[in-house]
Regions:
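Short, conserved beta-strand/beta-arch hydrophobic-aromatic motifs that form part
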Residues: 35-53
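Divalent cation-coordinating acidic motifs and surrounding scaffolds
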Residues: 75
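Negatively charged, low-complexity tracts enriched in Asp/Glu with abundant Ser/Thr
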Residues: 1-32, 52-71, 79-80
């Protein structure tokens, strides 16, 4: 199971999300306050992730410690 910390965050808050895994890369999609968000992992050797959690209309790439960085962004959201 990939993106375990982010999945646990959603489960603890009882927030619905979709998760799937392909080629050792996890993907999460979810809706929050009417907007659609994604977290998509990149495969080795350039392990990282792409997500729009910082700004819903713009995707950005996260490198080292991507799961921790994305999780910290999610924790700043109100009403989560």
């Amino acid at each position: 199971m990939r993106l375990a910390g982010i999945q646990q965050f959603f489960k603890e808050r009882r927030l619905p999300f979709q998760y799937w895994e392909d080629d050792d890369c996890g993907s999460i999609e979810f809706d929050h306050r009417g907007l659609h968000y994604h977290i998509w992992e990149f495969p080795e050797p350039e392990r990282g992730a792409q997500s729009n959690v910082r700004i819903a209309g713009r995707s950005e790439e996260f490198g080292d410690n991507y799961e921790e960085v994305i999780l910290e962004i999610l924790k700043t959201w109100e009403e989560f």
